[in-house]
A protein has these predicted regions:
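Non-catalytic interaction-recognition regions
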Residues: 1-94, 105, 109-498
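Short, charged, solvent-exposed linker or helix-capping segments at domain edges/interfaces
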Residues: 95-100
Length: 498
């Protein structure tokens, strides 16, 4: 049993014998100073009024009761105005090893998510180019978060939303089409915002190699063909990059399918019937202000084209229709202003605002020896996720992406990540693991074998302060894993390891 859980059970027994209720404001937490014990509690302070006695007097009675009834405690002391400082016996901490041994890979698993279906949508980059390092951070956070939630008992489905409709996709088709015409020696006029990446030229050349007569098509047909081929080529590349990064989405959901199957229009009709939409200036608007947004939002523009928001409402409605109790979206921090309107949309389709969680991912600054690397595709400069993974490896890249809170800016120093020094958090953790494996290897070479089951008698020498501190640290993992799931904060695991 976890130390906090064990102590709470003992405290509850003491209160029951005193005919006192468990107070809502009771806290049991690790002591700020190890000299003052393993755990500290304010139980006497928050129970004094109900007991009708001064906090220190009540604390003294509780301490005496604990000393007499709980043999796993080495000491219980009263401090300050009535705090209780508790130190567990070495035997209690050594029992932690038995629990870890018995649970094996399941050690730390929780059941807080049992019976709850969660969808985690992450990355969802427009298929207009290869994934960059910002997408890599989102991939690492989303994938790790899904793993943590599963570990906590949630039924998790991971999903990638393919933005294959709208202006950006039309622009992709146009960019490839113009490059193809240029390769054919046809003069073209370039729009200001076309896609300039060298990958566009590669796709156009590939299409021309397969179909030399491509540019004889009409502009409309040529752009459509270039869009379809280009999007699929880029999407295949994205999937391959994610596989190399050990990220596998269970579902790939097409935005275009929402439009083609009438889901967007159906959503419009529902909003209209609920009195949550209105026409103004030839456009269709959603009354998001009814749900606390700072202004109403356009769903369909005056030219008849749909906004991204329109598709996003239909998409989130579809998520809940598929039976998910909770939806987690992992977005770039530049979408922070989008959160209130999506919360409004979720409520408009009949869900609670808290049924949608949004994890924001801040920018990644790529550095080389402390100097920022320009984000371009020129030779020798790293921009894409594939480039970074090739340079430092999957493990190092994933760990670095998770080494800070997701909503904090991250400096990713390529030189530091490759350093074999304690300044490199990746090396620090890997080195600790290597040392442990080395101890086990040398023990085997010396003919020492570990018993199949933990023999507590063999652990008696583990009584030094450093030994007990390590056991206490291992005991904390259950709370760390559970807390990471509840807070949607994968970095809690990284911090624990560091």
């Amino acid at each position: 049993m976890r130390a906090e859980q064990h102590l709470e059970a003992s405290f509850r027994a003491v209160l029951k014998n005193m005919n006192l209720p468990w107070p809502d404001k009771a806290v049991i937490e690790p002591s700020k100073d190890p000299k003052h014990g393993d755990l500290a509690s304010n139980l006497a302070l928050v129970s004094a009024k109900a007991a009708g006695m001064p906090p220190r007097e009540l604390a003294a009675k509780m301490a005496e009761a604990l000393r007499n009834e709980d043999t796993s405690l080495a000491s219980v002391e009263v401090a300050g105005p009535g705090f209780l400082n508790v130190t567990f016996s070495p035997e209690f901490w050594r029992e932690t090893i038995r629990r870890i041994d018995d649970a094996a890979d399941r050690f730390g698993q929780a059941t807080v998510g049992k019976g709850c279906k969660v969808q985690v949508e992450y990355v969802s980059a427009n298929p207009t180019g290869p994934l960059h390092i910002g997408h890599g951070r989102g991939a690492a956070v989303g994938d790790t978060l899904a793993r943590i939630l599963r570990f906590a008992g949630y039924d998790v489905t991971t999903e990638y939303y393919i933005n294959d409709a709208g202006r950006q996709m039309r622009l992709l088709g146009l960019s490839i089409w113009l490059r193809a015409k240029e390769l054919a020696g046809i003069a073209v006029e370039w729009p200001e915002d076309y896609y300039r990446g060298s990958y566009i030229i590669d796709i156009a050349r590939e299409m021309m190699d397969k179909d030399p007569g491509l540019t004889s098509l009409s502009d409309a047909e040529g752009q459509d063909r270039c869009f379809a081929y280009g999007m699929q080529t880029i999407l295949d590349g994205i999937k391959e990059d994610l596989r190399e990064f050990r990220v596998e989405h269970q579902v790939w959901f097409s935005e275009r399918s929402l439009v083609e199957h009438g889901a967007v229009e159906e959503t419009f009709e529902r909003l209209k019937k609920a009195g949550l939409s209105f026409e103004k200036d030839g456009a269709l608007w959603f009354r998001t202000t009814d749900f606390g947004d700072d202004k109403d939002r356009v769903l369909r523009k005056s030219d008849g084209s749909l906004t991204y928001f329109a598709s996003d409402i239909a998409y989130h409605d579809d998520k809940y229709r598929r039976g998910f109790d909770r939806v987690v979206d992992v977005w770039g921090a530049d979408h922070h202003g989008y959160v209130p309107r999506m919360k409004a949309a979720v409520q408009a389709v009949g869900r609670k605002a808290e049924d949608l969680d949004v994890v924001l991912i801040q920018l990644v600054n790529l550095l080389e020896n402390g100097t920022q690397v320009a984000m371009s595709t020129r030779a020798g400069q790293f921009e894409t996720l594939a480039d970074v993974v090739k340079e430092v490896g999957v493990d190092a890249a994933r760990f670095m992406f998770l080494s800070r809170k997701s909503d904090s800016h991250l400096d990713f120093d390529l030189a530091l990540v490759k350093q074999r020094s304690m300044d490199n958090p990746v090396y620090y953790v890997q080195y600790a693991h290597a040392r442990v494996r080395s101890v086990l290897r040398k023990a085997a070479e010396a003919g020492l074998t570990l018993p199949e089951k933990t023999d507590l008698a063999l652990l008696v020498p583990l009584s030094e302060a450093e030994d007990l501190a390590l056991l206490h640290f291992l005991d904390r993992f259950e709370d760390v894993a559970k807390g990471a799931a509840q807070a949607l904060a994968p970095h809690h695991i990284s911090y624990y390891l560091m």
